[in-house]
Amino acid sequence: MKKVSIYTDGACSGNPGDGGWGAILIYGNHEKEVSGFEKDTTNNRMELVAAINALKMLKEPCEVDLYSDSAYLVNGFLQNWVEKWKKNGWKTSNKEEVKNMELWQELDRLSNIHKIRWIKVKGHSDNEYNNRCDKLATDEIKKNSKK
């Protein structure tokens, strides 16, 4: 299985508001940057979308180290939220529908294809790749938002 590192970040101008996401995939000496934009979204959705789109770039099952500064994204798997939600019919402990359910379901599907290690990094720190992802995300907002 190929080993790939993925860094992701999401950003929002207003919450909700215009959002951007960015990701960097690293395999050996190769790097690929991807990014995108959505209107009327939230920062949490952008964090999930960044991870989904990065994982969808992989053409075969891989061992993935996925780095994110989003506790929301990382804890979904490290704290077993996703497993609990699935057992509860995608309802929270308060019997409410899980927010961003369709995105969590897609991440769950992708996590069954790839062997993913979810790694929390400190946001806006000295992590070069996280900072680059943040710039990709915010550049998408600047490029696509109405002035």
Curated annotation (Swiss-Prot):
Compartments where located: Cytoplasm
This protein's record includes keyword Transferase: no
Cofactors required: Mg(2+)
Transmembrane segments: none
Domain of life of the source: Bacteria
Catalytic activity: Endonucleolytic cleavage to 5'-phosphomonoester
Record-annotated RNase H type-1 domain positions: 1-142
GO biological process, one term: DNA replication, removal of RNA primer
GO molecular function, one term: nucleic acid binding
Cofactor remark from the record: Binds 1 Mg(2+) ion per subunit. May bind a second metal ion at a regulatory site, or after substrate binding.
S-adenosyl-L-methionine listed as a keyword: no
GO cellular component terms attached to this protein's record: cytoplasm
SUPFAM superfamilies in alphabetical order: Ribonuclease H-like (SSF53098)
Residues reported in the UniProt entry to bind Mg(2+) 2: 9, 134
Binding site for Mg(2+) 1: 9, 47, 69
Annotated Pfam families: RNase_H (PF00075)
EC numbers for this chain: 3.1.26.4
Function description: Endonuclease that specifically degrades the RNA of RNA-DNA hybrids.
Entry similarity comment: Belongs to the RNase H family.
PANTHER family: RIBONUCLEASE H1 (PTHR10642:SF26)
Subunit structure, interactors included: Monomer.
Protein name: Ribonuclease H
Upper classification of the organism: Bacteria, Bacillati, Bacillota, Clostridia, Eubacteriales
